[in-house]
């Protein structure tokens, strides 16, 4: 519910051309509907909300938006609802000036498959920004319908900043996903920092190479915010204590197994479970240290 409320509020705040849907009660009703269904329903309702605001600008804008949204839906509906969260969060991250947090978070939580939904989210945000910036021309009667469509088409296809951002998002998602799934210690933290640095470097040098106007301070602050948010996600989602890592091995009739066990940070050492694997009987015996301690105290008493 909260995510849907934020999404619909941000869309109304960014566009807000149709007064009938630019209303807190409409946002609340749509948010309640989304609370009962999957994230895909929220995505479809958000697209319909965008389409309604575009219709208030002009029929040409609404038609162009409908074609663009259908193409995006064909892409992102092929993925799971968890991956499609990236499509919803990307426009929000731009309005909050922390776009780097989306590819970093998607890379550690969902993997490389979320690169496509996040890229679609980038295109969706820049299209809404285009409609907002060119609303005066698009609403004017002196501009021909074909000129309006050409304006929208050029604003999407020739937007170098948008395509640079799409490439950066895809690169960061893939890099973070690969590093975070490695077996070495602190893989998530290294992936988060690496992803933020890659975002900053590609955005800065890409902007210089493509002559795109960007704010250096905003890019750096977005990268720093991505690191902070990534560490928070790592603490709640992974939360392991690498200082207590244990390496062990066991074998059966066919294989020798080398196991690296990293305990959760919130699990105290006295409550951990020790599993002993027997190769002959292939029986797993679980011995809990706290129960052994209690048995010893009972016998002593």
Kindly give the residue locations of the regions a language model identified:
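Short, highly charged, low-complexity non-transmembrane loops/tails of multi-pass membrane proteins
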Residues: 239-291
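Short, aromatic-rich membrane-interface segments at the entry and exit
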Residues: 16-25, 39-43, 59-65, 82-86, ...
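Hydrophobic transmembrane alpha-helices
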Residues: 1-47, 53-54, 63
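Short, charged juxtamembrane terminal tails flanking transmembrane helices
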Residues: 290-301
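Membrane-interface helix-loop-helix junctions at boundaries between adjacent transmembrane segments
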Residues: 32, 45-118
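Generic multipass alpha-helical transmembrane bundles of integral membrane proteins
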Residues: 92-224
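Transmembrane alpha-helical segments of multi-pass membrane transport proteins and ion-pumping complexes
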Residues: 1-5, 9-13, 35, 39, ...
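Juxtamembrane/interface segments at transmembrane-helix termini
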Residues: 135, 181-185, 212-216, 232-251
């Amino acid at each position: 519910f909260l995510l849907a409320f934020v999404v619909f509020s941000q869309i109304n705040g960014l566009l807000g051309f149709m007064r009938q849907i630019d209303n807190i009660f409409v946002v609340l009703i749509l948010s309640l509907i989304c609370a009962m269904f999957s994230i895909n329903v929220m995505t479809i309702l958000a697209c319909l909300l965008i389409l309604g605001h575009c219709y208030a600008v002009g029929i040409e804008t609404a038609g162009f938006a409908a074609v663009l949204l259908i193409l995006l839906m064909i892409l992102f509906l092929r993925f799971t609802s968890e991956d499609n969260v990236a499509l919803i969060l990307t426009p929000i991250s731009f309005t909050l000036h922390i776009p780097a947090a989306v590819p970093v978070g998607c890379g550690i939580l969902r993997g490389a498959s979320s690169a496509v939904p996040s890229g679609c989210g980038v295109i969706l945000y820049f299209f809404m920004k285009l409609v907002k910036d060119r609303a005066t021309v698009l609403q004017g009667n002196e501009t021909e319908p074909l000129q309006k469509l050409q304006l929208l088409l050029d604003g999407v296809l020739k937007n170098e900043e948008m395509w640079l951002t799409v490439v950066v998002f895809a690169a960061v998602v893939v890099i973070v996903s690969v590093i975070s799934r490695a077996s070495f210690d602190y893989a998530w933290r290294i992936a988060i920092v690496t992803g933020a640095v890659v975002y900053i470097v590609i955005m800065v040098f890409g902007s210089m190479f493509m002559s795109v106007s960007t704010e250096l301070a905003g890019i750096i602050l977005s990268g720093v915010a991505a690191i902070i948010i990534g560490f928070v996600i790592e603490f709640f989602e992974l939360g392991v204590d690498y200082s207590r890592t244990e390496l062990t091995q066991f074998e059966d009739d066919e294989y020798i197994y080398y196991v690296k066990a990293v305990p959760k940070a919130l699990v105290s050492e006295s409550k951990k479970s020790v599993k002993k694997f027997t190769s002959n009987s292939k029986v797993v015996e679980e011995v809990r240290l706290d129960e052994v301690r209690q048995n010893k105290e009972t016998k002593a008493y």
